[in-house]
């Protein structure tokens, strides 16, 4: 096994988000830049939108003359 080929690991790597939020984590890089974090992601902020796919199901049923009842 070769010595000294592993990348240097930084325990205090800084993660910077586009929204301005910063936090620390462990990484092989000193600084990480991300577009979305837990402070601005819709799932974590409660602004998540539920997509209704019922229209697609109804279109399929209409196309193949299927009824909702079995």
From Swiss-Prot:
Cofactors that this protein relies on: Zn(2+)
GO cellular component, one term: ribosome
Entry annotated with the keyword Zinc: yes
Keywords noted in UniProt: Metal-binding, Ribonucleoprotein, Ribosomal protein, RNA-binding, rRNA-binding, Zinc
Domain of life: Bacteria
GO biological process assignments: translation
Cofactor note: Binds 1 zinc ion per subunit.
Keyword Transferase: no
UniProt GO molecular function: metal ion binding; rRNA binding; structural constituent of ribosome
Record-listed Zn(2+) binding positions: 17, 19, 37, 40
PROSITE patterns tied to this protein: RIBOSOMAL_L31
Quaternary data: Part of the 50S ribosomal subunit.
Role played: Binds the 23S rRNA.
Similarity section: Belongs to the bacterial ribosomal protein bL31 family. Type A subfamily.
HAMAP family: Ribosomal_bL31_1 (MF_00501)
Name of the protein described by the UniProt record: Large ribosomal subunit protein bL31
Organism, as annotated: Clostridium acetobutylicum (strain ATCC 824 / DSM 792 / JCM 1419 / IAM 19013 / LMG 5710 / NBRC 13948 / NRRL B-527 / VKM B-1787 / 2291 / W)
Biological classification of the source: Bacteria, Bacillati, Bacillota, Clostridia, Eubacteriales
Annotated gene: rpmE
């Amino acid at each position: 096994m070769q010595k000294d080929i592993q990348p240097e690991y930084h325990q205090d790597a800084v993660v910077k988000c586009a929204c301005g939020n910063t936090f620390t984590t462990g990484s092989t890089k000193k600084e990480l830049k991300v577009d979305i974090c837990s402070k601005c992601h819709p799932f974590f902020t409660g602004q998540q939108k539920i997509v209704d796919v019922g229209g697609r199901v109804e279109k399929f049923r209409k196309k193949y003359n299927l009824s909702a009842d079995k």
